[in-house]
Amino acid sequence: MAKITIHTPEEIEAMRRVGSEAADLLDFITPHVKAGVSTLALDELMLDYTVNVLKAKSACLGYNPGDNGIPYPRATCISVNNVICHGIPSEKKILKNGDIVNIDVTIEKDGFFGDNSRMFIIGKPTIAGKRLVEATWGCMWAGIEEVRPGKCFNDIGIACHNFVKPMGLSIVHEYGGHGIGRVFHGEPHVCHVPISTPTAKFEPGMIFTVEPMVNAGKRHIMDLNDGWTVVTKDRSLSAQWELEVVVTETGYDILTVSKGMPEPPTWVKGWKKPNFD
């Protein structure tokens, strides 16, 4: 089993700072996410804000994990409707009423990474789109609520699976959360479905993302030929939310926190959004 970094209190506070700025980036872009705007225009606004306001770098721009040989060409991932993840911003992709949109941002500052994503609904939502977006938000929190010392990473996958299964929704198997800190993608890989192999137990100081990708149809995926974009094989809608989580002595805390982030579901017991007023 690969070693998972245990972060010091000082490192956790550094991660909290960069995490809050990554969340602030999503707050900044929120009023611009509307019908008639291209995903490239949104990406350019966020890159400018990252560099000139946050004084940070985009971790996505030029990112090359080495498995496809194609550096990622934009600063953010913007995935619309049936795009599961890694949607490349484009001037040709114009948002329209009823679209569901995931915006995923990762910034690097002072040697640490902050990574989060948020769903947006353009104009009047469709019944199916609104249901999926809300269900995915709950799915993520169901997984997060399992985090506390003594439990294990597989408990996240079990909780996420059990949350959406009664709704007839499916969770993508091929992608998951990840450790994060001084590296963008570290150990562990966080599965959002149950797995049969043993997983590590949570220990205070572990930091990772929880980011289930939930499809309205079947779980199966298809890669487009641009080397990055992943879509649902049956063309059904897909949604994703992402937060950074740190294990504490008694439970967990959220590191990607901002004034504009949605309130957690009312049934969440382990965390309360801070008062920014």
Task: Kindly label every feature range from the protein language model.
Residues 1-277:
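Active-site neighborhoods and metal-handling regions in enzymes and metal-associated proteins
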